[in-house]
Amino acid sequence: MKGLIIGLASFGLTSAAAVSSLAQPVARRGCLVSDEGAIQDPAIQYTEKTVRRQNFPSNFTVDVNFHLASTEEEADLITDEIVDAQWKVLHEAFARYDINLVLNSTERTVDNLTGSAFLINEGPDKGWVYHEEEYNTYLKATRKGGYDALNLYFFSSYSPGATGYCQWPTPLAETDELTFWKDSCQLSAMTMPGFTAEQGAFESWNLGHLAVHESGHWFGLNHTFAGGCSEPGDFVSDTPAQLTQIFGCPEGSDSCPNQPGLDPIHNYMGYTDDACTNEFTPGQKDRMFSTFFNFRRK
């Protein structure tokens, strides 16, 4: 799959449009980041050239800020042990690709609206109501660091069935204040390692790999199934084409038999089980470096 793709907003898909899907709870795992697979933009060609032309450092360091939001009933749910386990998974996953994540801060908020990710079921008349104004105010008060700082928000009660969402890197953050403040990843705490099924953990996605997946979007990676079997797919040349979302861990799966390679079921940017995912490709590493230094740290 050839080419590169950058920001959500730069493709005419605003962050508000993507987040609004929170108002419609889904039935199974759902990363709420849209599939940009078929969308073209001048930034693609620009970044494809720079990844060949520029000499990026062999490694780089990124400050990470954890934000833990719980409802009053679930105030003690996200324990320090769970946070430590999640951090270990996240740090080790990216360290293998010469991206050194440093935990800069961890802060907790106990509040029913915040802990519910600002999505409340207000009864049969109103249904699910997304409190966007309060959400924006919360982000402005809590987001830390510059545009090159990764802020991860874990919510004890998230949109039912959804697992997470993350912002793409975009040049709009340089001129639009709200785009900057919204630059973050949000996740269901039930994807963190250490929760049990009785506590509400996702059965197949509770080893902490969702934080790796969403952070991959923050670094500019698309889903492996973006674009299906057609070029340019996910805009990374060494990830085999994949027709659609794949669940479980079906070894030998080949949903695009006329394209080289088997389905990349072990890639962090797919939807297979946490126990199945363990890698990025060299091309994905190159793309993370390129998008980071072209859009996040110039």
Residue ranges and their predicted role:
Residues 62-68, 101-103, 149-154, 183-189, ...:
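Structural recognition of the beta-strand scaffold that forms the well-ordered cores
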Residues 69-72, 107-110, 156-161, 191-194, ...:
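Solvent-exposed loop/turn segments at secondary-structure junctions
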Residues 139-223:
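Active-site-proximal segment of zinc-dependent metalloprotease catalytic domains
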